[in-house]
């Protein structure tokens, strides 16, 4: 009898555990990882961009330390680079190669890790060339090079006289006389 009484309470308890187990994965599935949220933001950047080509995530700065509240907006900082894929191709940017000497943009803003919230607040600015961002070393005057000793001149070979071809002589022939027209007699009956 005692076993039959414990059985309904055990069934209820297992039912509650089953329901709780089903609810927990769905709640955690709604929260995006920091990287996934940034990739969605890059997707929206590509949709709203007026550029010819798509942008792809180049570098992602580390996430903020206070990642406790999954629904709150999180500050993000990342860089995107222009790809070879046209924006109208509808191809995922991750499948596109970076464009050689493509445009690089630094993006700063906030994203939400909640899948139900698609709002992103981003500000992207074009980066200057990497060489320009590095500090320049002070230029010191270069020491003057020591004069090099002149090499000894070697005797140059004598130039060979240039051969001029001799004209080909043909046997001489007297010129032919040019035929001249004979004068016609004037008729007398005139």
Curated annotation (Swiss-Prot):
Cysteines paired by S-S bonds: 85-96, 107-124
Protein name: Cathelicidin-3
Organism annotation: Ovis aries (Sheep)
One Gene Ontology CC term in the entry: extracellular space
The family this protein is said to belong to: Belongs to the cathelicidin family.
Main location: secreted
Signal peptide limits: 1-29
Keyword Disulfide bond found: yes
Gene name, Swiss-Prot/TrEMBL: CATHL3
Record field: compositional bias (Basic residues): 133-151
An example Gene Ontology molecular-function term: lipopolysaccharide binding
Described function: Exerts, in vitro, a potent antimicrobial activity. Probably due to an impairment of the function of the respiratory chain and of energy-dependent activities in the inner membrane of susceptible microorganisms.
Record-annotated membrane-spanning stretches: none
Keyword terms of this UniProt record: Antibiotic, Antimicrobial, Disulfide bond, Pyrrolidone carboxylic acid, Repeat, Secreted, Signal
Ranges annotated as biased composition (Pro residues): 172-190
Keyword Metal-binding listed: no
Superkingdom, natural source: Eukaryota
Propeptide regions on this chain: 30-130
One Pfam family linked to the record: Cathelicidins
